């Protein structure tokens, strides 16, 4: 099992998307479906750092969900179990490594219910046909110009793998990472490229451009698609 230290900070994959088809899909959506981080991620925000979530709301960050929590867990969404342990270390481990103590609401693997507008779409078909691993929590990000996604850590690559496909508004956008506490900066191009991003490291997005940034994000439940990018052998 590969962990964050075994993988690069960012890797451009050998899979490309048709940006025009994604833009057409986004244009076809009910624009009322965009929601703030709380509306689009009901329940799962309980398992993230509260200050970070408030920061997303402050920066007018929005998402359009394509995959949602499985219907059998919708009732638990109202009052998910937050018992993650007694010590700070235990709570951190259960949050960032997504152990089996986590409620299904907080488990991204359970966010694989395809919404009606997503079923049969170009994005769904392209992911299914080109990636070996199953996907979950597919969504569209919208970060307004001049705003930021504050530094944060999501989870280790041993739990799941994050993929991002920039769609538009990437000029003067910095994707910052801090592996080994050293800042690294990247600019991801909106040219159809798909990138693995190592969200086990602290990372942020700083938007200094003049156009809102829109990106496709999804999670892979396993590591088959990034194993060839490992910088060190499994331990």
Give the location of each predicted region.
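Generic structural hydrophobic/aromatic packing signal, biased to beta-strands
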Residues: 13, 22, 138-140, 197, ...
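Intrinsic-disorder/low-complexity, polar/charged segments enriched in Ser/Thr/Lys/Arg/Asp/Glu/Gln
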Residues: 8-12, 148, 160-162, 215
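Short beta-strand-to-loop capping motifs
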Residues: 12-17, 167, 218-220
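Catalytic core of Fe(II)/2-oxoglutarate
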Residues: 169-235
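Catalytic core of non-heme Fe(II) oxygenases with the double-stranded beta-helix
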Residues: 122-195
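Non-heme Fe(II)/2-oxoglutarate
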Residues: 1-127
